């Protein structure tokens, strides 16, 4: 919180994606020594104690003048990440390779990946589709749902549930046995989205990710378990909240 308010980075996501290189106790001790010594001391502290992220690029890759389909096909190798090593920091390691959006987005994202898979399907990248679905299945089995992305700061929220549509894509390539293979994970995710539905009533019509409409029908909604600023957009959320208060 202190660091995010210092405005040392133009992007709030930079610090929360940094990897600690020393123990928490050591970092705390070093911070206490320099916390009132200005920006240059703070930057040195960050460089000495954290591996700071940069925008991921692929050496030697340049946008060319080929047609859009060829350009996209070339991008798969640029945006593909191998299975993760177990590191400290906020990244949740995934057991299989996956595609990232790129730039400041260095991790897999839930519903984005469905549209990525549609492109992968066109280019015959079925194994990559399989690996990404297996990563999402891993997250369902580990956490009971698919987070916004594979970062610990995303564990309080999900994104629109496209997992079943991803299974449809894979089934188109590998046949209907795919549905049986992933049925346990499909059911677990459904239970996550429907949690609390039996406790809804006309008086208490909203709970977690379920909403009871006046006619008795049930809808799902976007919901975050936390009501605090998002770590990856901390400064922006604080500003939005302040502006909302001032406006009212």
For the regions a protein language model found, what residue spans apply to each?
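Acidic, mature catalytic/reactive cores of soluble proteins
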Residues: 1-248
């Amino acid at each position: 919180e202190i660091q995010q308010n210092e405005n040392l980075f133009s992007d709030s996501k930079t610090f929360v994606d940094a990897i600690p290189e020393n123990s928490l106790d050591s970092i705390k001790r070093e911070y206490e020594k320099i916390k009132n010594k200005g920006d240059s001391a703070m930057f040195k502290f960050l460089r000495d104690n954290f591996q700071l992220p940069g925008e991921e690029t692929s050496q030697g890759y340049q946008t060319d003048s080929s047609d859009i389909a060829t350009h996209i096909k070339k991008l798969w190798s640029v945006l593909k990440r191998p299975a993760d090593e177990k590191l400290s920091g906020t990244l949740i390691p995934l057991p299989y390779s996956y595609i990232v959006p790129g730039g400041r987005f260095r991790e897999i994202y839930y519903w984005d990946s469905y549209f990525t898979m549609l492109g992968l399907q066109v280019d015959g990248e079925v194994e990559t589709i399989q690996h990404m679905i297996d990563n999402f299945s891993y997250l369902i089995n580990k956490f009971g749902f698919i987070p916004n992305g594979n970062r610990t700061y995303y564990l309080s929220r999900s994104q629109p549930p496209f997992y079943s549509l991803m299974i449809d894509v894979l089934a188109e390539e590998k046949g209907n046995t795919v549905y049986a293979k992933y049925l346990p994970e499909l059911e677990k995710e459904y239970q996550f989205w429907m949690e609390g539905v039996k406790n809804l009533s006309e008086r208490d019509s909203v709970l977690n990710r379920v909403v009871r409409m006046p006619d008795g029908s049930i809808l799902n909604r976007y919901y975050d378990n936390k009501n605090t600023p998002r770590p990856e957009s901390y400064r922006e959320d604080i500003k939005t909240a302040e502006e909302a208060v001032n406006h009212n």
